[in-house]
Amino acid sequence: MTTPRLLTDDQMRRFVAHGYLCLRTELPDSFHRGIFERFDALIGAEANLNPGNNLLPAVPELNRVFADPVVRGALTSVVGPDYVMHPHRALHNNPPGSDAQRIHKDSYWGYLRRVRNHRCRWAMIMYVPQATPLERGPTGVIPGSHYQSQRPDETLMPEVASCLETGGFLLIHYDIWHRKMKNHTQDKRFMMKFEFIRMREPDGPSWDHADPDWRFGELPGLDLSAVWRRQWDWLRGAGRQDAPVNDIDAAGLVDIDPRRRLAAINDVARNAAAARAHLPALAALL
């Protein structure tokens, strides 16, 4: 088995902030054409044989996807080297002219209690055996929304289309808001999703790590820099790293403008000692 292709620091920072990455397997196009044909035989226009959780026994060739070094490296990077595959999986069809879904978070299959977590304990792979340009109805995601328990305001956190190449896959934090977009073409579009679980707390970086500093480029809608920094440190196996802050904008904590309010909250979150004086204002926000 080939060595996993681990994510870089920049890719991990983007995953922490945005909650997803668009990647591609190293498997040849001929393999993906074969998978497309197998999916078509199961759930194409003339068939209704969706195997549900029995997808791997029905299409055992899919094991090659999960042995792919890019897939293994991506999963190792975000959920640790001893991750496990959950028994729930699904094969989805987006036929020509089908309508878009409503934006949603997936439920945790088999769990009666809420297990959502900002930390990356669950991840999902969404693999497509054919290219998914915008007109073919790719998966739409709201970058950064894995930190939001309620559907985000579209004016603050807009949706983007995760257009993939043939054999591409979407690596997502399990709690990200997403949906199937409308297929405007006469082409069939299939997607399979598998879930993966972290088995232990990180005790060090599990990706190709060189730079311990948190930095980011493109903002995914809202600036949650204090949250991102904490997740980054947790994934590195590091303790809490308080950062010096200037005077905290106390009035901003209760301002009607969500961006000013969030900036003030970020300042408080960066330094626990400075936050103590503002606990009443923070409690009032709950």
For each predicted feature, which ranges?
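Short inter-helical turns and helix N-cap capping residues of alpha-solenoid HEAT/ARM repeat scaffolds
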Residues: I256-D257, L286
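Catalytic core of non-heme Fe(II) oxygenases with the double-stranded beta-helix
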Residues: D99-C163, P205
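Non-heme Fe(II)-dependent double-stranded beta-helix
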Residues: M1-V115
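Short sequence/structural elements of tandem HEAT/ARM alpha-solenoid repeats
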Residues: R276-L282
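Short edge-strand/loop segments of extracellular domains
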Residues: N93-P95, G144-Q148, E195-E201
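Non-heme Fe(II)/2-oxoglutarate
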Residues: R179-A251, D257-R270, A275
